[in-house]
Amino acid sequence: MNEAVSPGALSTLFTDARTHNGWRETPVSDETLREIYALMKWGPTSANCSPARIVFIRTAEGKERLRPALSSGNLQKTLTAPVTAIVAWDSEFYERLPQLFPHGDARSWFTSSPQLAEETAFRNSSMQAAYLIVACRALGLDTGPMSGFDRQYVDDAFFAGSTLKSNLLINIGYGDSSKLFARLPRLSFEEACGLL
């Protein structure tokens, strides 16, 4: 049986963690980005399909390439973040299933149903984005996930000619807590959950 993590870890991962819009000028190393992936890759996905593909943008040139895709409300926070991750999904993720899920012919589940393949890729890459956020928090980083961007522009600018399609953006760095908004409420258990 697993042991519960400490109250401090729960605070870091959930109750005290915030979505950041402002950033300190502390850089995030490439080694730290590798550590993030080394943690997040272990999160579960359907049939271990692991459809997420991530581009970590950490240069001024990369940010300028991304700039035209950003909504006005997400522009400044993204340009000043040390790293912006494009979380994409591979529309042909199933080509890796013989390696990732060698328990029967899982590849055929998706090659025979393009709709199932797309739904699976999008849903599971979204879950993997959440794992990325938790991995960042576990390593002492802050994040700012965003869906306010022109996905078609990002796909054309970063993934043209490939099987990748963008899902969401996540700013990564060390947040400036002085720029946080007041914490917003969440739904109660009674409002969000049911017991049968």
From Swiss-Prot:
Function text: May reduce toxic product malonic semialdehyde to 3-hydroxypropionic acid, which is excreted.
GO molecular function, one term: 3-hydroxypropionate dehydrogenase (NADP+) activity
Pfam families in alphabetical order: Nitroreductase
Listed Gene3D superfamilies: NADH Oxidase
Lineage, highest ranks first: Bacteria, Pseudomonadati, Pseudomonadota, Gammaproteobacteria, Enterobacterales
Record-given protein name: Probable malonic semialdehyde reductase RutE
Catalytic activity line of the entry: 3-hydroxypropanoate + NADP(+) = 3-oxopropanoate + NADPH + H(+)
The family this protein is said to belong to: Belongs to the nitroreductase family. HadB/RutE subfamily.
Top-level taxon of origin: Bacteria
Keyword Zinc: no
Organism of this sequence: Escherichia coli O127:H6 (strain E2348/69 / EPEC)
A GO BP entry: nitrogen utilization
Statement: the UniProt record of this protein carries the keyword NADP: yes
EC number(s) recorded for this UniProt protein: 1.1.1.298
Induction: Up-regulated by the nitrogen regulatory protein C (NtrC also called GlnG) and repressed by RutR.
Cofactor(s) listed: FMN
Keywords: Flavoprotein, FMN, NAD, NADP, Oxidoreductase
